[in-house]
Structures are given as structure tokens and as C-alpha cells.
Amino acid sequence: MEMEEISENLTASHSIKLTNMWLELLKSVFLSTPQDLPEIILILSLICTVGAFLNMHLKDFPIPLPVILFLIGCCFEILSFASTQIQIYADAIQWMDPDIFFGIFTPVIIFNVAFDMDIYMLQKLFWQILVITIPGFLINYTLILWYLQSVNKLSLKTVPWLLFSAVLISSDPMLTSASIRDLGLSRSLTNLINGESLLTSVLSLVIYSGVVHIRFKSKSVNHTLAHKVMSTAWSYIVESFITGIVFTKVIQLWMATIFGDDVNHITLIFSVLYLIFYVCELVGMSGIFTLATIGLFLNSTSFKPGVEAFLLEFWNCLSFIGFLMVFTFIGLLIPAHTYLHISFSDVYYSLNIYFTLIVLRLLVFLLMSPILSRLGHGFSWRWAFIMVWSEMKGTPNINMALLLAYSDISLGSERERSQILFHGVSVCVITLIVNRFILPMAVTKLGLRDVTSTKYKSVYYTFQHFQELTKSTAMALKFDKDLANADWNMVDNAIILQNPYAMNQEEITEHQKVKCPDCNKEIDETLNIEAMELTNRRLLSAQIASYQRQYRNEVLSQSAVQVLVGAAGSFGEKKGEYMSPENIKNFSESKKLLSFLRKLLLNWVYNTKKDKGVPSRYMFLHACHRIVFTNEFEYTGYLVVLMSTYPMIICWISRLKDIYDNEIKCANYYFLAFYILEALLKVAAMRKEFFSHTWLLFELGITLVGVLDIILIETDSISYNFDLTETVVFMNVIRLLRILRILKLVTPKLLQIIDKRMSQQISFRYSILKGYVQGEMDVLNIIDQIASSKQTKQILLKRVMRNMEHAMKELGYLEYDHPEIAVTMKTKEEINVMLNMAREIVKAFRSKGIIHKVEGTEINKLIMAKKIQVLDLQSVIQPFNVEEAPCNIPWLSEDPEAITFIQEKAKVVTFDCGNNIFEEGDEPEGIYVIISGMVKLKRSKPHLEMERVSAESEIKIHPLPHTEYLLSGEIIGELNCLTKERMQYSATCKTVVETYFIPISHLYEGFEKRCPNMKHKMWQKIGLAITAQKIREHLSFEDWNYKLQLKLCNAFIRDIPKSMKTDIYDETVTHVVLIHGSAEDCQLRKIYKAPFLIPVTCHQIQGMEDFTKVMIIQTSIAVRKFRWNVRKYIPPRRISMKPDSERESFETLDETSEEDNGKKENQENEELIEENINI
């Protein structure tokens, strides 16, 4: 018993010791923290705080922020020798390994810079950047290496010199981009500098890593130097580039289903980037080159709207933190005793290196300037000079210098390591200080600031217009009763902003004048080349903003917005050229390869069910016909072809061919016999029709070549026992062609894939054209702000209208050829618009406190789930047919009785291409609903919105489209049938048009007897369309969909009589739109003609025609209750204008009724409060 107890105790104690050992191991691995962790956290927080403070307050300081941070780090390192407490904090940083230092900060900085590049301009400048960064980089690198070895001050070997040359040639793309951002350089020059700086830094990092890798491989693998260089270049450049493209596609596909700024996905993609970097480094590729490739091919349109903004801010924040850490830590990582050994010769050597780099870089640019200037985009010696002085050295140079100084490569003594690090960092500091002073002066002296006098004046007047709008808004707020006792003098002084583009009186009154070459007459205003170029740039900027806005609203796809923005950006720097539908067509042309492949498959592969032919009367031929056209016979042929591939493959392998020579011959005889038998059976079954099929003749030709091969072998004309001759190779290739027969099996699937791909290309082209048309319509709304003078406005207006007409015609032809594509695109677009509006409603409810944050989050999840379902929506939706046409008419869709009535006498009318549906001046015959096709509406002369507007009116006057194209689903003749006026335009069919015709007599029969509300619905539909367009011109583009729909929910139609005045605006009315006829402002005596948004300053109008209608938009009920329930300011109750209400003046209401109404509302509010309290 005692022995058992002792053994049990020993076992228990042993298990306890094992448990304690595992616990200690887990604690040491997972729960241990370095003793200096608090010091590290304090230093990092202090660096971020100081760096952010200096960046905010020392932007214009002569000494750059990186130099200040470096000096702070140096001071901290020197003070660490004087104080033990400071030494503790310095040691917390100096333990960091250079590889960790490089791997933490460099990847995020390089990726962020690449991601922020303008990929469209880089594509345009591709050849210039390629010439600069490949031959130019190699020449510059060779010259730097030659200079360092010639001077040989540091007495290094070949490998350290190669690495130190890479340190000196590199540049910092982030600091370079920041240095030229506010200098006013042209867009082409700015992107050329940024692209060259990024690729130079990446190539220098690749060369540094490659040299280290080659040196490491030389110790372990015995290969020639050329083999090592080629294999390293292949893995570090080619493989890294391919990997970057693959990961780009994977990230785009992954992020395609992410909507909104989901923090989990943002964190995950950040982690994925570092994972990609370290995986590439582990497998022998360049992680930096891979990340730069991913950053260049990813851009803001690679992600769903709402994601890219958060990502960009997140990466900018990380890049800035990395920038602060690098320049502060490097001051700490240079040993303090290095400064004690600094002599004048060391400083002179650093200055010598700096000026030598400048001279060599300028020499390289001047040598390549003839080639660069011939590549276009205005390259000159001035550009070369600016590119030389704009180069900033920073993070890549410091990281490589740190790696070189602390690497295992033999550099001699510790002092030589410190000298390498000192000279590498000192050249960066000198570059940052000197170039900061010289670069702005060089830009000014060389006249490269892209700020012309016309542009300067335009910006001045734009700022002045902005100031006037601010003051006018303040004037309107003075009438608000809640702000009556505010100190408006202080408000007026507070909103006065100093114009940064102020000019003297002479510059303001000066007008650039040009003389006419014919009459030598001075032309006033600024209608010259400079003004037109400025207008073109603003136009392109407005178009790009419209395309990006459509993408954020999910109207445009990612690929479509990339093409549109790229096309617009490619014309930003081309003088005298502008974007047009022809240019868009070049970008959006579908690939013709798919059409060729589809025709090839359809022509080569015959359909057995269709080509059976007529069986012969003879028994033998009839039996052959039955055998040939069975599935068993066909699939037996496929099986034999598959079996014959193995001997054919063996024929190409010399060793196996010698071993199985007899077997291959026997197999060849058997297979050839089967092919001959198959051909004879097909000839007997199909007879003459056999020779009308290309594929059968092709197979017969291959069989005859096989027979010829057998004859040549048997007669010893050729032999397969020796090396392959041309004849043998030809015979083997002909045999392999028989494998193409297998394509007949997969042809249906291939055709489905090709058809789907072609459908995607057509959808892509449709999206581009529609986005372009919407962009031109958005430009029309702000054309007054774009044009700098009346003449440029007229030129721009004609151009925009012409381009929009051309694009609409192309869109119409595309929709006519592929109606299912148009229906699918419109359906998906409308679903996305509605879901976005639902999200805006949830956002508005949350801001007002109607729903809680948790409830809003749950609703948003449901909306996001629906948006993901839209991605999986069927690719093709068939257009509606004639039976469904009445259900798609807005004023019939919810009334089954009206639909039944309309269908009684409505009919389908088809017009040939070129026929007129009606001509201008004809009496209206009825309403035409376009089922399919395209109709061109044209007026005999341009029709202005306002023909009788007084001269002192300041209302915009834009000509309506002289020519317009209507597509399927649109309705013609509604307004003329309602007013019984003659047609104001001609309707011509540009294609075969199928319409759903409703006679006017039948329509009025419905108005009077069966469906009296139908007339009001038609006016409502017309009024909403006009009102939406007019209100859109005065709403913010960002959220106009939600605001507009919110406003149109409270709209109704009202007639304006000709014989009496009508009050329109009161506190319950937000907008009044004149949708038909004309009216006169009773106070200002201005005449407004439809369509027109009547200004708020107009309180009474009177009709000028027998038939005048307005659309009135009221505030929501909740807003009116809020306004009326203010006890201190109880306004007089006013009757809003309802469609059927009697006219009553706002001033004739009795005061007692006002008090009664106020008391009644107050009582209702008190009861409501009591009910809420009880609940």
C-alpha cells in the first residue's frame, strides 16, 4: 500500500510539474511583454503628437518638417549619453532590427503613393516614363557607380558600391509629390514627375534587394553570374508584376460585394497588403514591386462607393505616421559618436555627392530630351530642369542606407558603417533643404506656373460670386423671426472673406482684346484661345465630376467610369481638342475577336439534326444514312479521336517513339482504317451534300494525308527512325489537327460563354454612352459657371448640344439592336437608385431621432443584402411586349379599369424606317407609346424657353434641344392631346418603330365618361417631369435624388386663370414651377414662359394665356406643424392652394379664427404630450 501511495504521489507531482512547464511556456510565448513596452508606447505617441503639431503650424517654415524631425531624433540620441533616464527611452528604439524597420514602414508608403497616382495620365505618359525610368535610370545608375568608385573615399568593395549607388539614386515619391503640389505646374508635368519618382524608388529598391539576393546565392549555388542576374530579374520583376496583376483582380472581385465603410473589411484588406508583401519576400519575389503594381492598377473606382474614401484616409494616416517614424528614428539610429568624428571633409563629400547627383541627372535628361520631346505632351529643357530639382530623397534612401550600414556585408570597421549611414542621410537632408528653396524660384523664373491671366481673373470672379451668394443667403435669414434679435453687423463682418485672388482696379477693368484679321476691329471680352482653353478644362473637370458622381450613385459600373474618366483626362492637356462621342466610341468599341470566333464556330461545326438530308431509296444507302446519323456513331468517332491522341503524342517524343515504333505503326493503321470507313459511310449517307460541308472536307483531307503517309512509309520514301525531317513534321502536325473535332462537343458551351461575354461588352458600351449623355446634361445645368464670357458660353452650348444629340442617336441604335440589354441595364439602375434612396431615408430618420441607431443598422443590413442580390440578377431581361404596354404607362399602371378601357380601341401601329409619324403643325391624333425602335423629334427652328421675358430679367435662357431622340418606353403627344394644340415638332422614324397608339377621341371619351381622374394623372406626370428637371438645377448634386423625391411627394397641379391674380408662395410652399403656358409677375411685371421655376420673391402671378398650369410643391406636414406650434410666434393661418379649393386671399382671414385655430392646435399638442407621458 505504501509503495502504491508513493508511486501515486510521484505520478501526481510529475504531472503537476509538466502542467507547470506548459503554463510557463504559454506565458512566455503569449503573455510575455518586453520590459520597455511602456517606453515604446510613450515615444510613439510623443512622435505622432509632435509631428502632427509641427505639420499644422510649420507648413511655411523654411526648414522642411523631415529635417526638423531628424534633428529632434539626433538631439534625443546625443542627450541619451548625458542622462540615464533618456538612455532608457533611446534603447527602446535602437533594439529594432533594420529589416523590421524596412518591413513596417516602407510597404504602406509605397502602396499609398501608387494608389494615389492618376492612372489615366500615367497611361497617357507611359512611353515618356518608360524612357526615363529604364534607359535613363540605367545610365544614371552607371554614372553614379563610376563616380563613387573614381573618388573611392570610403574604400569599399564592388558589392557595397553597387548597394550605395542604389541608395543615392532612389527618391521619395511621397515627398516629391508634396513638393510640387502647390507650385501650379501643368497636369502632364506633375504626373510625369510623380510617375518617374515612384518607378525610380521601386527600381532602386528592386536593385538593392536583387544585388543582396545574387550575393547570397553565389555562396550556396554554383551558377554563372549571367544566370543569377537573369533569374533574379525574372523573379523580382516579371513574376512580381504578374503576381501584382493577379492579386489586383482578386481584390477587385472581393471588394465588388462590399458596400459602405465596413471597418472589418477595411482592416482585412490592410492586413492582406502586408501579407502579400511578406509572402512575396518569402518566395523570392519583390514585395515592394508587387505592392506598387497593385496600387497602380487599383484606383478609387475599383471599390464600391463609400469604401474608397475611408480607405484613402486610412492609408494616408498610416503613411503619415510611417513618415514621422522614419525621420525621427533615423536620428536615433545614427550612433552619437559618429558626430564626434565628423570632419570638414565628410561634409564636403556629402555636398559633393549632392551636386554630382544633380549634374548627372540633368545630363541624363538633356541626353534623352530629343526622344522625350518627340513623344509629345510638350516636353522641353524647362521640364527637364524642373524634374531635376523636384526630386526629393527620403524614406527609401534612409531605409536602404540603414540596411546597408547594419547588414552582414563586409564594410570594414564600425566607423565605415557609420559613415555610410551618415552620408546616405546627409544627402537626403541637403536635398530637402536646398530643393525647397530652389524649386519654387525655378518654376517662377522658367514661367511654368499654369496660372494665366484669364484663369486668374476667372478664379477671382468665381470667388466674388461665391461671396455674393453667401451675403444673399444672410439677407434672406434676416427675415427669419427666430433670428430677429441677432447682431447682424457681427454676422456680416464674420462672413466677409479675404479674396486670395484679389487684383488691382486696372486688372479688373482690363479686357483682353483681339483684332479681327478681316476688318481690324477689336473684339471685346475674352473670346480668345486662352479663354477657350480655360473653358475646355472646366468642362472636362465638370464631366469627370459627373461621371464620378454617377458611379457613387451606382448608375455607372466600375469599368464604364474608368473609361469615361480616362477619356476625359486624356484631353485635359491637349489644346484645341475636346471630348466627343467619336472619342468615346474609340474607347468603348467592342472586341471583334469574339464575333469572329462565334462565326467560326457556327460555320465549322454543322448541326446534325439540320443536315440529315433525304434518305436514299436504296437499302444499302438508306442503312448507311441511319447509321451515320445516330448518336452512337458520332460519339464513337469522338472516342476514337481521343484514343488516337496518345500515339500521336508519343511520335513527338524521340525516346518513347523508338521503344514503341511497331505499336505506333499498328495503331496508326487501325485508326486510319476507321477514318476511311467513317468517310465512306458519310459519303454514302449524304452523297452530294457531303461536299458542301467545310468541316467534312477538312476531315477528308486529313484522312487522305494519312493515306499518303502510309504510302510513303511503305515505299521507304521517308523514315521515322532518324531525326524529324520537314515532311515528318508536316505529317504529324496534320494528324494533330484532327483533335479540333473535339470542339464539336464543347461548342454549345463555348457559344454560351461567348454570347455572355458579348452581352457584357454591349452592356459596357451602353453604360458608357448613357453615362456620357448624363454628363452632358449635368454640364448644361452649370454652364454659366463654366463659361467665362457670353461668347464662350454660346460656343460651349452648341458643342454640348451637338455632342449630346450624337450620343443619343448612338444610344438609340444600340437600344434598338439590343433591347434586352437596355431593359436589363435600366432595371438594375433603378433598383440601385431606389435602394440608395432607402438608405438615405434611414439616414434621415436616424438624424431626426425617429429610429434608433441599432434599428437603423439592422435596416441597413437588409438594404445591403438586397444590393448584393442585384449583383446576381439575371444577365438578360426581356423587354415588355404589346400586351404589357398599357401597364407601363404611368397614368394607367395602377388603374385596371382605365387599362381595360384604353385597350378597347388602342392598336399597334408599325412605321418603317424614314417614315414620319406626324409633322410639325399637324393636329394631334392621339398618343404614341414606343414599343421598340427610335424616333427623332425635330423642330423647324430653335425654340427658346422664354420668348417674352423682359430685358432686366436675370433668368438663365438656354435653348431647348433642336433635335431629340426618343427610345422604347417613351410617350409622344401627351401634352398636345391635353391642350389640343398643333404639334410643335416632327417625329421621324430612324429605325423600324412599333408603337401602341391611343386615339384622341377615345382618350377624351375616357376623360368625360369612364376615367375622369386620368386627365389629372396625365398632367401630374408631365408636371413632375418638368418640376424634377427645374428643381434639380437648384439642388446639390450629391443628394438630389432623395431631396427631390421628398419634395415631389407633396406636389399638386393648379390652373392659373387669365382674368384674375393668384397668390402662390406662402410658408407652406417651397417651389412653384410653371409647366405650361405663360404668366406675369404682378409686382415686378416680368413675364415667365414654361417651363420655368418661379422665384420665391414672386407672390402673385396672372395667366397670360388661356391655358396656364403650375406645379406647387409644399412642405411636409411635420414641418408645417412645427412652424405653427411655436407659441411665441403664432403666424396667421393661411389656406394652401389645393387643386379644388376656392380662391381665398391670405389677408382676409379673421383674427378670431386664427386664435381659435392656435388654441385648438395647442390643446391637441397638450393632449398628445399627456398620452406620451401616460405611455
UniProtKB/Swiss-Prot annotation:
InterPro entries: Cation/H_exchanger_CPA1 (IPR018422), Cation/H_exchanger_TM (IPR006153), cNMP-bd_dom (IPR000595), cNMP-bd_dom_sf (IPR018490), Ion_trans_dom (IPR005821), RmlC-like_jellyroll (IPR014710), Volt_channel_dom_sf (IPR027359). Signal peptide: none annotated. Residues 1-39, 83-98, 152-157, 213-225, 284-286, 340-344, 412-415, 654-657, 717-724 are extracellular. One of its GO terms (molecular function) is sodium:proton antiporter activity. GO terms for cellular component: ciliary membrane; motile cilium. Residues 618-698 are annotated as: Ion transport-like. It is a multi-pass membrane protein. GO terms for biological process: cell differentiation; flagellated sperm motility; spermatogenesis. Residues 1137-1146 have a biased composition (Basic and acidic residues). Residues 1137-1175 are annotated as: Disordered. Residues 60-64, 116-125, 184-186, 258-261, 301-307, 375-380, 447-632, 685-691, 752-1175 are cytoplasmic. Sperm-specific solute carrier involved in intracellular pH regulation of spermatozoa. Required for sperm motility and fertility. Involved in sperm cell hyperactivation, a step needed for sperm motility which is essential late in the preparation of sperm for fertilization. Required for the expression and bicarbonate regulation of the soluble adenylyl cyclase (sAC). Interacts with soluble adenylyl cyclase (sAC). This is Solute carrier family 9 member C1. It comes from Mus musculus (Mouse). The gene is Slc9c1.
